[in-house]
C-alpha cells in the first residue's frame, strides 16, 4: 500500500505535479513538488491512505530539490510490503504494530547474502498479511540501533512480538526464517 502525498504552498499553486507516492517510512525525504526557489517556504504534506486524509504535516524546504517532513509525522506499521526503517522510525513503527509480529531484516548494501534474501523477504511480506516486515540498512547512520539490537553478522533477522525481540535468525536461511516466524505467530 502506498500513500498519496499532496504538497501545497502558501505562495500559490504548484507549477509541477503536486502528487507523489511514497512508502510511509521512506517519506522522511521526498522530491520537492513545487516550483520556485524561495528559501524556507512553508508547505504542508497531506497524507492520504485509502479514501480519507490521515494527516496534514508541516514541511520545511530550503530551496533545494528536497524537503524534509517534520517530526510530527506518524509512524505507521504497514503489512503487505517491506518498509525501510532507520534509528528514528524503528521503535515507533514497532509500537504501532501492536500485537502483530514484526520481522526486521538487518542488512548492508555490500552484503551478497543480503542481496539474495531481499527478493525472498519481499515475497514473504506480500504473502503474509498478518506480519509487519521491516528492513534496516546497518550503515553508519543506524549504527546505534544495530548495536542496541545486538547485531553481529548480516543478514540478521529479528522477530518481535509485543515490542520485544523473541527470535533471531542469522544468515541467509530462508527455511529457518519461515519456521521462526510461524513459531512466533502461533505462540
From Swiss-Prot:
<keyword id="KW-0809">Transit peptide</keyword>
<keyword id="KW-0934">Plastid</keyword>
<keyword id="KW-1015">Disulfide bond</keyword>
<protein>
    <recommendedName>
        <fullName>Thioredoxin F, chloroplastic</fullName>
    </recommendedName>
</protein>
<feature type="active site" description="Nucleophile">
    <location>
        <position position="114"/>
    </location>
</feature>
<feature type="domain" description="Thioredoxin">
    <location>
        <begin position="73"/>
        <end position="186"/>
    </location>
</feature>
<keyword id="KW-0813">Transport</keyword>
<feature type="disulfide bond" description="Redox-active">
    <location>
        <begin position="111"/>
        <end position="114"/>
    </location>
</feature>
<dbReference type="InterPro" id="IPR013766">
    <property type="entry name" value="Thioredoxin_domain"/>
</dbReference>
<feature type="transit peptide" description="Chloroplast">
    <location>
        <begin position="1"/>
        <end position="72"/>
    </location>
</feature>
<feature type="site" description="Contributes to redox potential value">
    <location>
        <position position="112"/>
    </location>
</feature>
<dbReference type="InterPro" id="IPR017937">
    <property type="entry name" value="Thioredoxin_CS"/>
</dbReference>
<dbReference type="Pfam" id="PF00085">
    <property type="entry name" value="Thioredoxin"/>
</dbReference>
<dbReference type="GO" id="GO:0009507">
    <property type="term" value="C:chloroplast"/>
</dbReference>
<keyword id="KW-0150">Chloroplast</keyword>
<feature type="site" description="Contributes to redox potential value">
    <location>
        <position position="113"/>
    </location>
</feature>
<comment type="similarity">
    <text>Belongs to the thioredoxin family. Plant F-type subfamily.</text>
</comment>
<keyword id="KW-0676">Redox-active center</keyword>
<keyword id="KW-0249">Electron transport</keyword>
<feature type="active site" description="Nucleophile">
    <location>
        <position position="111"/>
    </location>
</feature>
<feature type="site" description="Deprotonates C-terminal active site Cys">
    <location>
        <position position="105"/>
    </location>
</feature>
<comment type="function">
    <text>Thiol-disulfide oxidoreductase involved in the redox regulation of enzymes of both reductive pentose phosphate pathway (Calvin-Benson cycle) and oxidative pentose phosphate pathway.</text>
</comment>
<dbReference type="InterPro" id="IPR036249">
    <property type="entry name" value="Thioredoxin-like_sf"/>
</dbReference>
Amino acid at each position: 500500500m502506498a500513500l498519496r502525498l499532496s504538497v501545497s504552498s502558501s505562495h500559490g499553486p504548484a507549477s509541477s505535479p503536486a502528487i507523489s507516492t511514497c512508502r510511509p517510512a521512506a517519506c522522511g525525504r521526498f522530491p520537492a513538488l513545487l516550483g520556485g526557489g524561495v528559501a524556507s517556504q512553508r508547505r504542508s504534506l497531506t497524507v492520504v491512505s485509502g479514501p480519507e486524509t490521515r494527516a496534514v504535516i508541516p514541511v520545511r524546504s530550503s530551496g533545494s530539490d528536497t524537503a524534509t517532513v517534520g517530526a510530527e509525522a506518524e509512524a505507521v506499521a504497514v503489512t503487505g510490503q517491506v518498509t525501510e526503517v532507520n534509528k528514528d522510525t524503528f521503535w515507533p513503527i514497532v509500537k504501532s504494530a501492536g500485537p502483530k509480529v514484526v520481522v526486521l531484516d538487518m542488512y548492508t548494501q555490500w552484503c551478497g547474502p543480503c542481496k539474495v534474501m531481499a527478493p525472498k523477504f519481499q515475497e514473504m511480506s506480500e504473502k503474509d498479511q498478518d506480519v509487519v516486515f521491516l528492513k534496516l540498512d546497518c550503515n553508519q547512520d543506524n549504527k546505534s540501533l544495530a548495536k542496541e539490537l545486538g547485531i553481529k553478522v548480516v543478514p540478521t533477522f529479528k522477530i518481535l512480538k509485543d515490542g520485544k525481540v523473541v527470535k533471531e535468525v542469522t544468515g541467509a536461511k530462508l527455511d529457518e526464517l519461515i519456521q521462526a516466524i510461524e513459531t512466533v505467530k502461533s505462540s
